[in-house]
């Protein structure tokens, strides 16, 4: 069943699969089906593996949903609850419409990353052909740690991924087109929906409240485009309008933004106006009565207000994550000039803002010394000094001087006796062994391997070494075998090594044998494989002894 860490988004009971009743589970990363009365899933598909979904036409006796996988397989689910079958099927369909595009982009991104790695690395591409195309190992096993290593390298170069901003004209991309039946069809993509949600949190809140409980996703966006919330003229909103409350929330938010003002003195344009110090000591700026009435009645003011609010929301959508990170720091610096500090108008803060604008870090003097932090995995080993294995006797300086004088006297009186160093028989046998044709000069007359072996054989041998090295790297990484996953992997890697030996190594041996090459070119590869087999045999023997 679902693990404790998995979030279950939707559960639909009375769903048949191959004439067997069960329940359908939609989780954060996969969809699964469990038979009735059992506590395990018999069908489970990751969203990234699903290509598309299909539903049965209206009027059919069976209310069905079909999942089409990238591999070409299909899975059918029959909603058998007569009273709510259509509603439950549509709820599953709408939820899948939201989830599948996210994982589809992720799958496409992984595929692009794999293609990029294969194009940039010819050795990796050849390794892929030798192991995956020849079916020595599966593609999942080949990419298991390749993508992880590449992700680790990329994360080390950049600690965080740059977020994609929001275009100020994203609503202009929603180009209405006539459908030929006195209707309009809007080009609404998942990116535009995400931009709407990030820019207008009130719409996202309405979406969560109504979809799919009160209406379908199609009905929601139809009412969104029909609403005055989407159009420029927002002076009059209907009482039954779903988005009337959103307009009020926007109006309130805009007033809050205006009341906060711009805290950065360098960006505050209103501070450039001359204000007489009359009543209120210059802090009360009340517009004239004649002018305020005309502004309310002017429809152009609503359009300008809408544009200002839209620009502010687009900027705020990109700065929400930055402000959340800045809350953890002591001195946040916001790009729009607004600061969360209440004491922003204090002289010290004002000086800090001015200093930040006129000083450059790269022009200042940096006297700090860069240090490298020591990462101790086992710090307790460094708490005590080294302990000697056995007791040592230290010599004094006088003992060292006396030893030096003694060695010096012996060297001055040394007389070489070369006839006693090596016997004549040993010297004669050594000369014979080092002569041409001797025991130690067997390879002296042989040609180099690059002159004896053709270039195509050399290239194929290099590919074999790279392939067997990759397989052995996976094999030896399983030791010490201390988890069930490693136990399963080491046995699987042994079968992969045997398959490689049969499909790649043996045909190569037969090929060089047909070309009458006397040099055993694959002896070292066979030795490496045999060492791996011996290691696995030793581990299995110890495992059996522990069980008995």
UniProtKB/Swiss-Prot annotation:
PROSITE patterns: BSD. (Microbial infection) Upon Rift valley fever virus infection, interacts with NSs leading to ubiquitination by the NSs-FBXO3 E3 ligase and proteasome-dependent degradation. Keywords: Acetylation, DNA damage, DNA repair, Host-virus interaction, Nucleus, Phosphoprotein, Repeat, Transcription, Transcription regulation, Ubl conjugation. The keyword Transferase does not apply. It comes from the Eukaryota. InterPro entries: BSD_dom, BSD_dom_sf, PH-like_dom_sf, Tfb1/GTF2H1, TFIIH_BTF_p62_N. GO terms for cellular component: nucleoplasm; transcription factor TFIIH core complex; transcription factor TFIIH holo complex. It is found in: Nucleus. SMART domains: BSD. The modification Phosphoserine is found at residues 339, 357. Residues 321-340 are annotated as: Disordered. One of its GO terms (molecular function) is nuclear thyroid hormone receptor binding. One of its GO terms (biological process) is nucleotide-excision repair. PANTHER family: TRANSCRIPTION INITIATION FACTOR IIH-RELATED. Belongs to the TFB1 family. Component of the 7-subunit TFIIH core complex composed of XPB/ERCC3, XPD/ERCC2, GTF2H1, GTF2H2, GTF2H3, GTF2H4 and GTF2H5, which is active in NER. The core complex associates with the 3-subunit CDK-activating kinase (CAK) module composed of CCNH/cyclin H, CDK7 and MNAT1 to form the 10-subunit holoenzyme (holo-TFIIH) active in transcription. Interacts with PUF60. This is General transcription factor IIH subunit 1. It comes from Homo sapiens.
């Amino acid at each position: 069943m679902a693990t404790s860490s998995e979030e279950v988004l939707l559960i639909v009971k009375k769903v048949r699969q191959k004439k067997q009743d069960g329940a359908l589970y939609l989780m954060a990363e996969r969809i699964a089906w469990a038979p009735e009365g059992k506590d395990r899933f018999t069908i489970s598909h990751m969203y990234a593996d699903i290509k598309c979904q299909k539903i049965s036409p209206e009027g059919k006796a069976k209310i069905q949903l079909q999942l089409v996988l990238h591999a070409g397989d299909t899975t059918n689910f029959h909603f058998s609850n007569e009273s709510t079958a259509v509603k439950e099927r549509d709820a599953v369909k709408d939820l899948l419409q939201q989830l599948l595009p996210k994982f589809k982009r992720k799958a496409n991104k992984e595929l692009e990353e794999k293609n990029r790695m294969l194009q940039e690395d010819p050795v990796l591409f050849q390794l892929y052909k030798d192991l995956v195309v020849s079916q020595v190992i599966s593609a999942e096993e080949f990419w298991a740690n390749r993508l992880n290593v590449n992700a680790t390298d990329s994360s080390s170069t950049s600690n965080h991924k740059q977020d994609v901003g929001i275009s100020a004209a994203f609503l202009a991309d929603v180009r209405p087109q006539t459908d030929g039946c006195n209707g309009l069809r809007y080009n609404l993509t998942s990116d535009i929906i995400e931009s709407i949600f990030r820019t207008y949190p009130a719409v996202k809140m309405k979406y969560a409240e109504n979809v799919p409980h009160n209406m379908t996703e199609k009905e929601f966006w139809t009412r969104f485009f029909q609403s005055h919330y989407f159009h420029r003229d927002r002076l009059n909103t209907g009482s039954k309008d779903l988005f009337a409350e959103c307009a009020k929330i926007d109006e309130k938010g805009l007033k809050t933004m205006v009341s906060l003002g711009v805290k950065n003195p360098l960006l505050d344009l209103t501070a450039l106006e001359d204000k007489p110090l009359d009543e209120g000591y210059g802090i009360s700026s009340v517009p004239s009565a004649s002018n305020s009435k005309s502004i309310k009645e002017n429809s152009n003011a609503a359009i300008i207000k809408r544009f200002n609010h839209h620009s502010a929301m687009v900027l705020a959508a990109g700065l929400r994550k930055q402000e959340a990170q800045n809350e953890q720091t002591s001195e946040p610096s916001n790009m729009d000039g607004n600061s969360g500090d209440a004491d922003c108008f204090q002289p010290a803060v004002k000086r800090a803002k001015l200093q930040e604008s006129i000083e450059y870090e790269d022009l200042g003097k940096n006297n700090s010394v860069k240090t490298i932090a020591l990462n101790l995995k086992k710090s307790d080993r460094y708490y005590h000094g080294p302990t000697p294995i056995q007791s040592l006797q230290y010599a004094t300086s006088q003992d060292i001087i006396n030893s030096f004088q003694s060695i010096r006297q012996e060297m001055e009186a040394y007389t070489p006796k070369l006839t006693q160093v090596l016997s004549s028989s040993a010297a004669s046998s050594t000369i014979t062994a080092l002569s041409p044709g001797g025991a130690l000069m067997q390879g002296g007359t042989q040609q180099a391997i690059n002159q004896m072996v053709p270039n195509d054989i050399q290239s194929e041998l290099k590919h074999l070494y790279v392939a067997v090295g990759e397989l052995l790297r996976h094999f030896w990484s399983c030791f010490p075998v201390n988890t069930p996953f490693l136990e399963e992997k080491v046995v699987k890697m042994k079968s992969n090594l045997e398959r490689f030996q049969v499909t790649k190594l043996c045909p190569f041996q037969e090929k060089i044998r047909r070309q009458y090459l006397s040099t055993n070119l694959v002896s070292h590869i066979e030795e490496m494989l045999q060492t791996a087999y011996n290691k696995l045999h030793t581990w299995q023997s110890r495992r059996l002894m522990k069980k008995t």
